[in-house]
Amino acid sequence: NLEEDKLYEIESNIYETDDNGNVYKKNHTLLPEITYEKNTFDYTTDNRGRISSWNGKPQYMPENERDEIAQLEAGGEDRQEGDDGGHLVARILGGSSGNENIVPMRDTVNRGDYKKVENEIAQAVKQGKNVDDSGEIMYEGDETRPSKIKRVYEIDGEKSVLKVDNVKKSFDLMEDFEENIEKNDLENLLCEIDDMHEDGCDVSITSILKKYDQSGNLLSIRVGIRNETDGEKTYKTYDMKKAG
């Protein structure tokens, strides 16, 4: 058995072990189709060695340092201008610092839509609430840069589902909520987007956040909208459409 969280050099190759002493990296690259544990979180990789999911219980760890090199290198050739190296699980929540917990993420998503949820989770953990956190990362084709990230977290039994779109000028998330909000709310949102387009602005729907009660009933939906031309970001919260 190998020691946990160690580097081993064997025949000019460097191997790294996770919290259980299992090898999960070769020459600093994640191995394909494995499950590894770092800082109490379990992660999986797909057949190309890309992070595909995570789950665990966040802890409040404000003293954790970042790995700036891993953040700068995330995504390799598929990284785009304006990307951050975004932690899937924030360092302050016990997420590890290296590329085993980092993907290229639009800066507006990482510092806005995603950060808002991290702050909510951190506050709940600080207050001693029971928090579970999991997520899925989606990719287009062979790209190493995610197209979307879905995060599901429960705070004292109340579920929230965040979806972020990592693609500029995308409206893919519209189909995830257009059936859930009142018709006039949807029409007003579409009119607002049309007005921005008529003004010559590019627009993205960057995120949706669905909030549920303890019985699993959908209560509200928050939509993140970005004017890509002037950089203005707005968040709009809608109540669930009434039955009938």
Task: Identify what each model region corresponds to.
Residues K26-A243:
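Domain-level detector of nuclease and nuclease-like folds
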